[in-house]
Amino acid sequence: MKEFVISEAKVETAVLVGLITQTQDERKTNEYLDELAFLAETAGAEVVKRFTQKLPTANSVTYVGKGKLEEIRQYIHDEEEAEREVGMVIFDDELSAKQIRNIEAELKVKILDRTSLILDIFAMRAQTANAKTQVELAQYKYMLPRLQRLWTHLERQGGGSGAGGGKGSVGLRGPGETQLEMDRRIILNRMSLLKERLAEIDKQKATQRKNRGRLIRVALVGYTNVGKSTLMTLLSKSEVFAENKLFATLDTTVRKVIIENLPFLLSDTVGFIRKLPTDLVDSFKSTLDEVREADLLLHIVDISHPDFEEQIEVVNKTLADIGASGKPMILVFNKIDAYTLSLIHISEPTRH
């Protein structure tokens, strides 16, 4: 399935939106928006503006308040800066179908959330049939509860006709409930097929792991873009694709490594990130099995990152979610040459 969010034909401009809440202070929100901007750039968008708002929790109707939404609308449609052509607004949290529908109706531009952006990047990065199948399944899981919103969006954009040939109108009068239900069945059938394919892939990979013999298996884990693939290249003395972008690695790479006459198998797999979509973790079960089946985990940490401690916690939580938290683990601090205490926002030395 092709990526369905950002076109590669031209660079689209984007506005980011985040919330400062009771559980997420301003510094944390700005860090999350920095990461969201990196995600947007990885997907091929150019970020031109950020908006934040202090709220106890996200507005269930429009995510931000009415006044803030109007401020964003005015910025997007400011005639004095028409050449800016803001193409999308990206929200730092996952939005419900109702929120997306209401925000789109107000802003009249494409609305994305962190989840759809991550899914788009995964779709761009997927190279093998295995990765493509896993991403497609995750996309359908995300899309299914939002089908009605997608149909409404298409009707507004194209004014399509329904099964009876009549011109479309507001809501679902164009495609109609029958078409909506038909599409839902098509997606459910496609998801069943993808799950069957992944089950076969699971069996094949399990056989491959069994055929590797009794060599010790070591897996590199860590936050995305911390240097796992670079370390893999160094230890295995073979080229592994590495790039200063998020999720440069999706497919698992396994190499035989010998250090001081001790042979072992070293695997490099997808990195983790804050607010990683649950559906994506579930869909990548066969890839993450390399982590679950490992004898030892090397947890790579970018020690130069100002929020490296939270990144450690995110990785540990994700490992627990996939059933790999009990594995023997060694913390490996990377980019130590760029580390300075002044970069770390802590009141006392870190426990790590």
Where are these regions (language model features)?
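Residue-level detector of conserved catalytic or cofactor/ligand-binding positions
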Residues: 342-352
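Flexible beta-alpha connector loops of hexameric P-loop NTPases
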Residues: 23-27, 59-61, 125-126, 239, ...
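Conserved G1/Walker A P-loop phosphate-binding module
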Residues: 162-189, 193-274
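Short alpha-helix plus adjacent loop in nuclease-associated cores
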Residues: 117-135
